[in-house]
């Protein structure tokens, strides 16, 4: 959460915006009404939560107990596991970022997943697809760099990472995704907001 806090503060500063407050809670907290009350009293008109499934669910339950209906966004944290089961119907209000979503059961990669893991019966059984796509694409990028380097030597692979191009992943085709000054292969255009609808992660139009 702390690294996200720094990034969010920079983003607010860049836009000349102020925040109503920053509150913290532990992963095993079951009541965050006091923190949320302070934010509400400070005039917060929306919330951004950085937490994983269970603690985010507790935030939603606390909001329900307060009767505070406020827009809430998050990083990828709520996308995994049993979020809507833990948070209840109000969990569908949370908008979170994703890099990839399965929206078609005929998707070739989804079909392969079903063949590999028979317990996957519907699109709702894959939460989140982002985790699969990120890992799959990262593996392809490393493989391309190893092939380019002609070696499994670490420094050689690192240098080859700056030269790879045309790697077709699930999220996108990567053309020169890395430079010495930019180690992130994904940019703002590669993210989308989504939310749960009846257990399935759906993109927000």
Task: List each model region and its residues.
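Extracytosolic ligand-binding ectodomains
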Residues: 1-205
């Amino acid at each position: 959460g702390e690294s996200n806090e720094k990034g969010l503060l920079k983003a607010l500063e860049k836009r000349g915006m102020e925040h109503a407050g920053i509150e913290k809670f532990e992963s095993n907290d079951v009541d965050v009404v006091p923190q949320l009350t302070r934010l509400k009293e400070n005039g917060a008109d929306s919330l951004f939560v950085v937490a994983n499934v269970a603690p985010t669910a507790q935030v939603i339950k606390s909001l329900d107990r307060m009767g505070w209906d406020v827009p809430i966004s998050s990083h990828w944290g709520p996308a995994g596991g049993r979020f809507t089961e833990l948070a209840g119907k109000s969990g569908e209000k949370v908008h979170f970022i994703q890099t990839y979503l399965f929206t078609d059961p005929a998707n070739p990669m989804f079909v392969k997943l079903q063949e590999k893991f028979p317990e996957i019966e519907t699109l709702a059984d894959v939460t989140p697809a982002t985790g699969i796509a990120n890992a799959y694409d990262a593996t392809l990028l490393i493989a391309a760099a190893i092939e380019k380097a002609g070696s499994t030597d670490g420094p050689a692979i690192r240098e080859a990472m700056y030269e790879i191009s045309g790697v077709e992943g699930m999220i996108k085709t990567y053309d020169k995704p890395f430079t010495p000054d930019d180690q992130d292969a994904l940019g703002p255009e590669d993210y989308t907001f989504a939310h749960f609808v009846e257990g399935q992660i759906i993109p927000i139009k």
